[in-house]
Design a protein with these regions (language model features):
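Pyridoxal 5′-phosphate
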Residues: 1-406
Length: 406
């Protein structure tokens, strides 16, 4: 893999911060965008900008074709059966809110939802809101001190009242890869086909090839901006047979068939779930990002990212005072650590002075932080353009600032 050629596709990597070359290690928060994505969005606004669907004029028809072609690209990328299984959203958060609202509308008081201890707040709070509204109970898969989910607990957690399991593919705070195949297998064997399995793929989609047929989840959500595409657009994949049974999430244009004051009938999936004017330019950018990725050998990319993770863990483990979380777990993309009892904000602030961008805090995963009895962590997260030289700069930066902090 020609890492230097890849890096040249990302203009922002040439920037300087505080007089230092940018070392961007905050990819779990958002990835940078290649030139082809920026140019595709600019080209759309220069030449094709129009609202999609129902327009008889040429610009609208061209914009609609572009918009729907990306839906087909996403279908292929996920190996979904039909484009009707691909719903555009604003991101993973909206996708999970959509599912929490629609999947629970017909549940009974006392029915149960299973989440995990390692979830991002976006895969906790929407389910809590739905549970409070409908009298549902939430149960939790615990994790061990390496951040690994205790999947054997599902044998006791799943019962006849269990209706939904929603788990992340990869922990956003620790980078731990969860054993989805085992979770879904237990869901099917213990809960049957009526037990819905939702996967938060926000941190998984960028570091692995996702095949929803092989995975056999009922729903899979991700955000485009974690996949080298723009902010403002996301995807929910859902099995068509289930989507057709779900009520709308929001009301407005496009999601209807016919509106009257006495009765309104709703569109078919996916349009039933896409009320209002969509983020067309962002969708075009997503298509460009997928095309960019499809030109690469993704198996080679993922192997390279694993190499970067191993190297980062090796380099940081050798630094006195650095404590790495989930050190022995299978991880991808993110490495969480602390420096002694120093607040991670202080670590991040000093590294920023050296041009190094990391994320600090609880990473919208407060239950994880409570598990370890810490306020937060420093998190370095990687992408296909991350180099070993950048990891060295991070390690050298930590060695430089630690004497100032301890």
């Amino acid at each position: 893999m020609d890492i230097e050629a890849i890096r040249k596709e990302f203009p922002i990597l040439n920037e300087t911060i505080n007089g230092k070359p940018l070392i961007y290690l905050d990819n779990a928060a958002t990835t940078q965008k290649p030139k082809c994505v920026i140019e595709a969005m600019s080209d759309y606004y220069y030449h094709y900008n129009a609202n999609v669907h129902r327009g008889v004029h040429s610009l609208s028809q061209i914009a609609t074709d572009m918009f729907e072609k990306v839906r087909e690209q996403v279908r292929k990328y996920l190996n979904a059966n039909k484009t009707s299984e691909i719903i555009y959203t604003r991101g993973t958060t909206e996708g999970l809110n959509l599912l929490a609202e629609t999947l629970t509308q017909n549940l009974q008081i006392g029915d149960e939802i299973i989440l995990s201890e390692s979830e991002h707040h976006s895969n906790i709070v929407p389910w809590q809101l739905a549970a409070e509204k409908r009298g549902l109970n939430i149960r939790v898969i615990p994790m061990n001190d390496e951040g690994v989910l205790q999947i054997e607990c599902l044998d006791e957690l799943i019962n006849k009242k269990t209706k939904i399991i929603s788990v992340a593919q990869v922990s956003n705070s620790l980078g731990v890869v969860h054993d989805l195949k085992s979770i879904i297998s237990k869901a099917r064997s213990l809960g049957g086909n009526e037990l819905r399995v939702v996967v938060d793929g926000a941190q998984g989609i960028v570091h692995s090839k996702v095949d929803v047929q092989e995975l056999d989840c009922d729903f899979y959500c991700f955000s485009a901006h974690k996949l080298y595409a723009p902010m403002g657009v996301g995807i929910v994949y859902g099995k068509e047979a289930i989507l057709e049974t779900l009520p709308p999430y929001q009301g407005g244009g496009e999601m209807i068939k016919e509106v009257g004051f006495d009765k309104t009938t709703f569109n078919v999936a996916p349009y039933r779930f896409e009320a209002g004017t969509p983020a067309v330019a962002d969708v075009v950018g997503l298509g460009a990002a997928l095309s960019f990725l499809e030109r690469l050998d993704l198996n080679e990319v993922f192997a390279y990212e694993d190499e970067i993770m191993s190297y980062a863990q090796e380099r940081l483990s050798a630094i006195d005072g650095v404590n790495i979380y989930a050190k022995s777990a299978h991880k991808t993309g993110s490495l969480s650590f602390n420096v002694g009892n120093v607040h991670p904000f202080d670590v991040g602030t000093l590294l920023d002075q050296l041009g190094i961008a990391i994320r600090t805090g609880h990473h919208c995963a407060q239950p994880v932080m409570k598990h370890f009895d810490i306020p937060g962590t420093a998190r370095a997260s990687f992408a296909l353009y991350t180099t070993k030289s950048e990891i060295d700069t991070l390690a050298n930066g930590l060695e430089r600032i630690i004497p100032m902090l301890m």
